[in-house]
Amino acid sequence: MNENGRHQGQHEVLIRKYFLSCSYGSASEIADFFASDATIYDTNHQPISSREQIGQFWIDTREQWNGATWHVDSVIESDQSAAIEWTMKGTLDGDEVIFHGSEHYTIVGGVIREIRQYWSWRRNALTSGLLGYDYPDA
């Protein structure tokens, strides 16, 4: 069960553990969630390919945002796919930053094969997400 009393599917459990690893784990712990030929596609940077590069990418990103943490806000899943909304919290130059985004997963054999990440970042803004949407405190 999740915090809303709803049963979690196997993909949701995997993704929530992956997000905990992105927030607090090592590069190798993060890499363990991915197939060897996995790729992350993103609206803000070039694709990241291979589980090792993905693991190191999240360590670098966490450091860039001074101990950033990621939080799963909602999940919908089916046979080999899942879609989530997420929140990232971190700091930049002493100011809190909060980003919101959406990801689409392909999961095969209990590991992540592909993520397509959608979010926007404007250097002069300390938050991102849907315009006019009242996000709950994640």
What is the predicted function of each stretch?
Residues M1-D32, S36, Y133-A138:
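Short, low-complexity N-terminal intrinsically disordered segments enriched in polar/charged residues
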Residues M1-G5, D42-N44, R51:
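Short, charged low-complexity linear motifs
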Residues N2-Q10, G55, I59-A138:
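A beta-strand edge to alpha-helix "cap/lid" segment located at domain peripheries
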Residues F33, I40, H104-T106:
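Hydrophobic beta-strand positions
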Residues A35, D42, L92:
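Acidic surface patches and DE-rich sequence motifs
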Residues D37, N44, G109-V111:
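Residue-level recognition of short loop/turn positions
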Residues T39-S49, D60-Q64:
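A short gly/proline-enriched turn/hairpin at secondary-structure junctions
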